[in-house]
Amino acid sequence: MNIEVDFCHNMECFGAFEKNPKLAIAVSGGSDSLALMLLVKHWNEKVKGEITILTIDHHLRSESTSEADYVSSICQNIKLQHVTLHWIHKGITGNIQAQARKARYQLLTNYCQEHDILHLITGHHADDIVENFFIRLLRGAGLAGLSSHNLFFVNNVRIIRPLFNITKQDLKKYLEQQNIKWINDPSNSSNKYLRTQVRDLLKSMLISFQHNFTVELLKKRIMLSQMHLTQALESVNNEIIHYVVHVVKIYSAGFAVIDRKLFKKASPEARYAILSYLLMIVGANTKPPRFSSLQRISLHDIQEYNTYKTLHGCIVEYSIEYIIIYREFGRCYPISQVVSNSVVWDYRFKVVDNRKNNHMNLTIDYLKKSDYHLIKSYVESNQRNAYFNYSKKILFTFPVIKHLEKVVAIPHIKYYSDKTIQESVSFVFEPKLISRWFHYC
């Protein structure tokens, strides 16, 4: 195989790029990302884009800084711009890999946004896809979870995974041909991580198979199955679009409403997918909830009303007519922030501050129950407000503007004690997940 030709063909799958596109490539120093960097550089000879190499120093291992410097030195030799981004933390406990992945995407996409870069290219290769398939299978994933996605958005940045049919072995061979050495991350071979356990499981599975059934053949068969699943998902997507248009409303105040009667007519897969997207949008998440958790809240299992469940940073409330999904802060309430154009509150609401003179020190916060008595009469006199037709509890998830700890504005219900605020400060709902299927009321 000619890996450079195959890679250029893969890049065509993502559609046409704009003239002289700005591209970022996530490169750790491992074989996958270094090979990706060289392949993109070759492809870019025709595209004439502007490439920036981004390396994350996680500060979890003593070698991490020298590894970032190694990537920088390679970039200098091949004349590519390189930037090291640092994950600043006070020590990590719990699921280190999950937290590192979340921080990594946050740092990468933040940089892309700040430098007007739309495309972020990452080294997710065929072996990763196969391992993810088994990991999700072990967790009981549904159709959407088992299918593979090589193009998606995080924080309005286009994530591209062009190595989807290229194996790790082929990437290493390519680096050897280019006389480039790579770094081996010891965590990739540690049995305390599920991915390593799955990798070993795949190898052990072959022992009981016929002698001519190789690891590579197994990977190809699994990828073929994933392709069929992805095709099946496309047919479900048409159903999803239909029900999103006719059954779902997402309000710019950050909550969603589903027509319960019509939603019952959707297939289970469509219901699970729609609920998953809504929970990510409302709950400020970039990753979907577990399939088993979705089953708990599906209409297939819950027929009663005047009840609620909590999941994925959301409260899912059931009335006779509707399913209402709104934010649950739990134990982690959003912090109070000074109003300015750089603020994104609760990872969902972007502040628009058009004040020419910021002499009034305003803060953005959530509505506390102790604040409610100050606006109770206004709320009760505005019962016709569409938001109050569903659940008054939603009010306590809206962003409010305070001055000296007093609520002076709740823009989403048009409450203002100061007209100058009404004319100058507002919020725009910008959730982490952006989907072509949803629009906001």
Swiss-Prot record:
Look up keyword Nucleotidyltransferase and say if it applies.
Answer: no
Domain of life, per UniProt, equals Bacteria
Q: Which GO terms describe its molecular function?
A: ATP binding; tRNA(Ile)-lysidine synthase activity
Q: Which SUPFAM superfamilies match?
A: Adenine nucleotide alpha hydrolases-like
Keywords recorded for this protein, A-Z: ATP-binding, Cytoplasm, Ligase, Nucleotide-binding, tRNA processing
Keyword flag Cytoplasm: yes
The reaction(s) this protein catalyses: cytidine(34) in tRNA(Ile2) + L-lysine + ATP = lysidine(34) in tRNA(Ile2) + AMP + diphosphate + H(+)
GO annotation, biological process: tRNA modification
Q: What does this protein do?
A: Ligates lysine onto the cytidine present at position 34 of the AUA codon-specific tRNA(Ile) that contains the anticodon CAU, in an ATP-dependent manner. Cytidine is converted to lysidine, thus changing the amino acid specificity of the tRNA from methionine to isoleucine.
The UniProt similarity line reads: Belongs to the tRNA(Ile)-lysidine synthase family.
What is recorded about the protein's domains?
The N-terminal region contains the highly conserved SGGXDS motif, predicted to be a P-loop motif involved in ATP binding.
Q: Which PANTHER family match?
A: TRNA(ILE)-LYSIDINE SYNTHASE-RELATED (PTHR43033:SF1)
HAMAP family found in the cross-reference section: tRNA_Ile_lys_synt (MF_01161)
Stated name of the protein: tRNA(Ile)-lysidine synthase
Write down the species. Answer: Orientia tsutsugamushi (strain Ikeda) (Rickettsia tsutsugamushi)
